[in-house]
Amino acid sequence: MAKGRKPTTMNRSDRYLGSYTYGDSHGNSVTDELELGEEDIWSPAVIHDDTTENEESYGTWNLRATLGKNGRVGGLSLAFEGSLVAPPSSSPMIVQKIHGGGGEGEEDRRKLASSAPVNVPDWSKIYRVDSVESIHELDDEDDEDEESGMMPPHEYLAKSQARRSRKIGGGGASVFDGVGRTLKGRELRRVRDAIWSQTGFYG
């Protein structure tokens, strides 16, 4: 190519990337060629084969070509099917009713409206939660034990610990007493027990 020779036609990628640079010496034909048209940006799948570029027929989509293999159309495609075949006009668009009265549509609605039976689990059996009556029976037994008279403190503490472990579920209190049998661990345990008994945590 000669130095002064400029390309007369450019492809789209050259126009997008701007690989050609021009000076001020060329005319409107080159600048028109550099401008992007609507067809460069928007490339529809199928355009009607009308050669006239009037606004009514340009860029009209062919709905039949965009159908799937099974040929089904639903939703907005079905609603606007009649309006896309005819050229657009200045009159307002009338949306077609998708489901007509009677026929298969009502049967589908009946099927959707009914619900299957639901199995509701019995959580008291799953989590082994005692009923309200059994909790009251346990409280009555505890009251009978306390009414029996005076008992030594170590027996009272053992019974109260057993009662607490039954209410909680056998795990006992979830407070770490301390590592080993240190004085600090024992003292904190006594403080903890005193605070819990005064605040009513033990019951």
Swiss-Prot record:
Protein name per the record: Protein S40-6
Region (Disordered) location: 1-33
Main location: cytoplasm
Any Pfam family matching the protein: Senescence_reg
GO cellular component: cytoplasm
Localization in the cell: Cytoplasm
Keywords per UniProt: Cytoplasm
Similarity comment text for this entry: Belongs to the senescence regulator S40 family.
InterPro entries, per the entry: Senescence_reg_S40
Gene Ontology biological process: leaf senescence
